A protein has these predicted regions:
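A broad, low-specificity signal for short, low-complexity segments enriched in glycine/proline
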Residues: 15-16, 34-37, 55-59, 79-84, ...
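A structural motif corresponding to the C-terminal end of an alpha-helix
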Residues: 19-27, 144-151, 178-186, 248
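Generic N-terminal amphipathic, Lys/Arg-enriched alpha-helix
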Residues: 1-7
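Active-site-proximal beta-alpha core segment in soluble small-molecule metabolic enzymes
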Residues: 6, 28-177
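A short, N-terminal amphipathic alpha-helix
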Residues: 15-24, 46, 62-65, 181
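Active-site anion/phosphate-binding pocket segments in diverse small-molecule metabolic enzymes
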Residues: 173-350
Length: 350
C-alpha cells in the first residue's frame, strides 16, 4: 500500500536514550510529546519502554490511543471548557491559562471524585498562551490551591512556537522566580525542543525540571538552530510514494505564473528539458518543506494538494523514498496529519 511510512522503533528508542542522558545531566525530566505521531500506541510504548514517565499531546483523542500505558498523561494545549470532563477523565495533567477553565475542570474533577493536576502557563514574550500579567497569574494560583478538585502541579512556558522568540537564561530565571514566589515549583516546565540549545550551553538555571520534547526525541533535532544532536538518527521515519507519471518536460512553466492554492507565488529556474515524475502524495498528506529524498539523483521540485513533483535526475524505481521530519502527515507538524488513515505504517525494531 502506498503511500506508506516505515517507522524504525529501534532508532526512535536510541534517540530517546540519547536525549534522556542529556537531560538527566541537567536534572530535567522529559514529557514526550506524542502529537508528532498522532499518539500511535506502538511509538508511545517505545518512549515509555525507554523510561519516559510522562507523555503529552494537544488532542485528547490522541491521548486516548495510549490511555492504558503506565505513564502520566498531559494535555499540552489549554482545554476547551466544553471538553473539561474528558480532560479530567483521560488526562492526569493539563496546562491552563484561563480562570473559567480551571473552574470547569474543578467542577468535573469533584463530580468524578478525582484530583486533576494543573500547570499554569506564563507568557514570557512569545505571545501565544500564558498569563502575561502577574496579578492574573496570582489569582489563578490562589484558586488552584484552594480548589478541591485541582492540584497545582507547577508553572510552564512556551517559546519559539508563534513569534519564535527564543529561550534564554533571563526568561528561565523569571519563570523559576515566579514558581518559587508562589510555591508552585513541583514541576517547572521550561519549554520544548527549542530550549535544548540553552540546556547544552548550561543556560537553564537549577530548578527548571521539565521539558516537553517531541521533535528532538523522535528526530534528534533541536528546534532553535535546527541542528541534529550527536548520536541521534534522523531517518527513523521514511515515507514511500508511488510514481503515477514519468515524463520529460520543460523545467520552466509556460505562461504567466500566479499564486498557488496556499497564496504563495512559486519561483522556477530554467534548467531545460528534465526528467520528472509525479508521486501519488500531496500537501494534504505531508509537509513537503520538511522532507528530502533518500534516493540519490532525486530532488523535490514542489507539490500541490494531491501531487508531489520530483526531478528524476538519475534512474530510480517506481517508488520514491523521502525522509520525513515529522510524521503526522508523515512529515513535520503531525507525523500523521489529515490523511493518516490513507497512509500505511510499517514498523521495524523493538
Amino acid at each position: 500500500m502506498y503511500p506508506c511510512i516505515h517507522i524504525n522503533l529501534d532508532k526512535i528508542a536510541e534517540n530517546v536514550r540519547v536525549m534522556k542522558d542529556l537531560t538527566e545531566k541537567h536534572h530535567i525530566e522529559i514529557t514526550g510529546v506524542t502529537k508528532v505521531f498522532g499518539g500511535e500506541e506502538r511509538i508511545a510504548q517505545t518512549l515509555v519502554n525507554q523510561g519516559i514517565k510522562r507523555l503529552g499531546d494537544s488532542r485528547i483523542e490522541n491521548i486516548r490511543n495510549y490511555e492504558n500505558l503506565p505513564c502520566e498523561k498531559w494535555l499540552i494545549r489549554m482545554p476547551s471548557i466544553s471538553e473539561a470532563r474528558e480532560v479530567v477523565q483521560f488526562c492526569d495533567v493539563s496546562v491552563n491559562s484561563e480562570l473559567e477553565t480551571l473552574k470547569a475542570l474543578n467542577q468535573q474533577a469533584i463530580q468524578l471524585k478525582k484530583k486533576h493536576k494543573v500547570i499554569l502557563m506564563v507568557d514570557l514574550g512569545d505571545l501565544r498562551e500564558g498569563y502575561f500579567k502577574e496579578e492574573h497569574l496570582a489569582e489563578a494560583i490562589n484558586y488552584a490551591k484552594q480548589a478541591k478538585g485541582l492540584d497545582l502541579y507547577g508553572l510552564g512556558t512556551n517559546l519559539t512556537c508563534f513569534s519564535f522568540v527564543q529561550s534564554d537564561e533571563e526568561k528561565m530565571n523569571r519563570l523559576l522566580g515566579l514558581a518559587k514566589k508562589y510555591d508552585a515549583s513541583v514541576c517547572i516546565s521550561g519549554g520544548n525542543s527549542a530550549t535544548i540549545h540553552l540546556m547544552l550551553e548550561n543556560g537553564i538555571p537549577e530548578g527548571i525540571n521539565n521539558l516537553r520534547l517531541g521533535e528532538s526525541v523522535l528526530f534528534g533535532r533541536e528546534r532553535t538552530n535546527y541542528e541534529y544532536l550527536p548520536g541521534t538518527s534522523n531517518d527513523a521515519f521514511i515515507m514511500e510514494a508511488e510514481i503515477i507519471e514519468s515524463k520529460e518536460k520543460p523545467s520552466m512553466p509556460i505562461g504567466k505564473i500566479g499564486a498557488d492554492s496556499y497564496g504563495h507565488v512559486p519561483v522556477f529556474i530554467d534548467r531545460g528539458i528534465r526528467k520528472r515524475a509525479i508521486c501519488a502524495l500531496g500537501r494534504q498528506d505531508v509537509d513537503v518543506e520538511t522532507m528530502w529524498p533518500v534516493d540519490e539523483g532525486v530532488e523535490i521540485i514542489g507539490a500541490s494538494s494531491d501531487h508531489l513533483i520530483v526531478g528524476r535526475i538519475a534512474a530510480c524505481s517506481r517508488i520514491i523514498k523521502v525522509l520525513s521530519d515529522h510524521v503526522s502527515n508523515c512529515c513535520k507538524t503531525g507525523v500523521f496529519q489529515q490523511t493518516i488513515y490513507n497512509i500505511g505504517f510499517y514498523f521495524a525494531g523493538v
